[in-house]
Regions:
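C-terminal membrane-associated helical module and adjoining short loops/tails
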Residues: 2-6, 16-17, 35-44, 118-223
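Cytoplasmic-side transmembrane-helix entry/capping segments in multi-pass membrane proteins
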Residues: 67-70, 98-99, 124-130
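Membrane-embedded alpha-helical segments that form the functional core of polytopic membrane enzymes
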Residues: 18-66, 79-101, 186-199
Length: 223
């Protein structure tokens, strides 16, 4: 294996995956949210960059082809687990996350079972779109934590009556509470909608992979 830049970026993305969760054990919020968001977005961008550079410089390798989907899955799975811990077990979050995790385990199991025939389960364009939507959804949901915590910090010491008057426009909004609340709502519902879209694409691509694997699953084992 050659340590080309695309391979280095892939390894860095894999190494960054647990950092998204661990940072919440090291830093208080919202600083942890900021670092997790920056780390996740940077890692997601390397997913595009390493493939682009590998094609541009003709530096494709078996190592990169093997590690790239593993790094993607590690980033998504660890980030989703982190979000579940941050948001709690909300129905709107549990269902799409469960669908995404089930599909990832199912397809990985299919590939392992097929062995040298796993080449029939090549990554499709729709699967790439699925990964892109997943990563955008996760980034948006991490940003929700930032808006939520800045809002919470700014209302400390304010009575509910004052907060209500600010939202009613009766008192000057010096701390931008209305804007923070609006952006938090947009990030939350936007992230949830994108996550459900990703879950739908996840199911569709999972069924597609199963259909492609079925001819091999019907084969009788040879003695």
């Amino acid at each position: 294996m050659r340590w080309t830049l695309p391979n280095i970026l892939t390894v860095a993305r894999l190494a960054a995956a647990p950092g998204v969760a661990i940072i919440f054990l090291i830093l208080p919020r919202p600083y942890a949210d900021w670092v997790a968001l920056i780390l996740f977005v940077t890692a997601a961008l390397t997913d595009w960059l390493d493939g682009y550079l590998a094609r541009l410089w003709k530096q494709h390798s078996r190592f990169g082809a093997m590690l790239d989907p593993i790094a993607d899955k590690a980033m998504v799975v660890i980030a989703l687990a982190t979000l579940m811990g941050l948001f709690g077990f909300q129905t709107l979050l549990i269902l799409p996350v469960a669908a995404i995790l089930f599909r990832e385990v199912f397809v990985s199991g299919l590939r392992e079972f097929l062995g040298n025939k796993a080449g029939t389960l090549q990554v499709t364009k729709l699967a790439k779109w699925k990964t892109t939507v997943q990563m955008i959804a996760i980034a948006v949901l991490f940003s929700y934590g930032i808006f939520e915590h800045h809002f919470g910090m700014n209302v400390i010491g304010m009575s509910p009556e004052i907060v209500a008057q600010i939202f009613a426009g009766e008192v000057e909004d010096e701390f931008h509470l209305v804007a923070l609340s609006q952006w938090a709502n947009r990030a939350y519902f936007g992230g949830i909608i994108l996550l459900w879209l990703a879950a739908g694409l996840t199911v569709v691509t999972g069924v597609d992979y199963l259909a492609k694997a079925m001819p091999h699953l019907r084969e009788e084992p040879h003695d």
